[in-house]
């Protein structure tokens, strides 16, 4: 039984154009309050982004749903997430595919995310402390790559780790950011602009 707060959020997401029932089901099954600071628990099921420390945020549920829907996942999809953050987006993905790989630049965030995911009995996830700009070459290629912070341009390493027919979804830009979907067709990459967005920057190189 879905409680009222969850149902209200699902109704909002449908009204905003989210159609994939598998994505909506995953959102209903992941307790967002477990991924936010106690001070923000009362806002956990509101359709807003929230701070998680270290200058990072847990994305607005609409944006999580939109980006996940754009990946057109199947259970067999090999997925790479850049920016584990709180682990919330990771958990949504873990309900949709057999295995998720996730890279986080900030060690403390990676540690807390791993703890939360284990507490929720989500064990089909591999996390790595590393530079998201470099992806995860040892686990490539991927059918789907999702980036939860904005680089000024699309990282070439992520393009090279995308399998034939694969999809990369990411925000791109500095002050003016747009959500892009990149599809690989042989040696070509087809890029679609989806909508204007606002994300924290994808920091290059420096691990924290």
UniProtKB/Swiss-Prot annotation:
PROSITE patterns: PCMT. Belongs to the methyltransferase superfamily. L-isoaspartyl/D-aspartyl protein methyltransferase family. The active site is at 59. This is Protein-L-isoaspartate O-methyltransferase. It is an enzyme of class 2 (transferase). Keywords: Cytoplasm, Methyltransferase, S-adenosyl-L-methionine, Transferase. The keyword Transport does not apply. One of its GO terms (cellular component) is cytoplasm. One of its GO terms (molecular function) is protein-L-isoaspartate (D-aspartate) O-methyltransferase activity. The keyword Methyltransferase applies. Catalyzes the methyl esterification of L-isoaspartyl residues in peptides and proteins that result from spontaneous decomposition of normal L-aspartyl and L-asparaginyl residues. It plays a role in the repair and/or degradation of damaged proteins. GO terms for biological process: methylation; protein modification process; protein repair. The gene is pcm. Its EC number is 2.1.1.77. Gene3D superfamilies: Vaccinia Virus protein VP39 (3.40.50.150). It catalyses: [protein]-L-isoaspartate + S-adenosyl-L-methionine = [protein]-L-isoaspartate alpha-methyl ester + S-adenosyl-L-homocysteine. InterPro entries: PCMT, SAM-dependent_MTases_sf. It is found in: Cytoplasm. It holds the Pfam family PCMT.
